[in-house]
Amino acid sequence: PRGLLVEGFEGGESSLESLVREYAGERARALHRLDRDTTGVVLFAKNSKWNRALAELFEKKRIRKEYWAIVRGSWDKRINRIDTRICRQENGRWGNSKSDGKAALTTFRVLGRGEEFSWVQALPKTGRTHQIRLHCLAAGCPIVGIGFIRMTGATRFFYTLKAFRFPIPMAGLKFG
C-alpha cells in the first residue's frame, strides 16, 4: 500500500514486511523494495530456501518488472527506449547524465495517450535509483505528482509496479 515502508527499522513504524511476518512467519522476507509512495506488487519469500533461490534470480537479472505510470504530456510514440547514465547531482538529488554515473536503460510502450496525459508501460532493463522517474522526465513527460513537478491538487503520484515475470526455481515453471 502507498505510504507503507516495505522494510522497517528497529523501533520504527510498522512495515509491510512486519505485517507479512505476522501472517506467514518470521522467516518471510521482502525480496525488493518500493518507494513509500509507489504502489504495486511486492515479492516475498516464505523461507530461506526460496529467499536464496529468488534472490539469485534478482542478482542474475532474470526477474522482469513491469511498471505503469500516468505521465504529464502527450508521450511521443517514437520514444520506446531511453538509455542514460544516472548519478547524484551537485544538489544531492538523482539525475540523468550523459557521462557520469551508472548506465540505465528502460523500454517504454504507450498504453494510452491524450493531449495532457499519457499512460505508459515501463520495463526497466537495469535497476537504478529513480530510473523510471528520471527516464520519463528525459522524455519530457514527468510522472504525475512526483516531487518537484507535483500537479496542482495531486495528493499522490501515479506509478505502480504492476507485474513480475520470472522462472520458478526448483519447479521448472514460469511465473507472470
Tell where the protein language model's regions lie, with residue ranges.
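RNA pseudouridine synthases
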Residues: P1-L105, L111-G114, F158
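Short histidine-centered loop motifs in beta-beta connectors
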Residues: E115-L123
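Pseudouridine synthases involved in rRNA/tRNA modification
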Residues: K102, T129-G176
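Hydrophobic residues embedded in beta-strands of well-ordered beta-sheets
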Residues: R93-W94, S118, L173
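A structural micro-motif recognizing beta-strand termini
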Residues: R72, A122-K125
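Beta-strand scaffold of nucleotide-dependent catalytic cores
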Residues: I82-T84, V120, R133
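Ser/Thr-glycine-rich phosphate-binding loops at phosphate-binding pockets of nucleotides
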Residues: T38, A45-N47, P124-L134
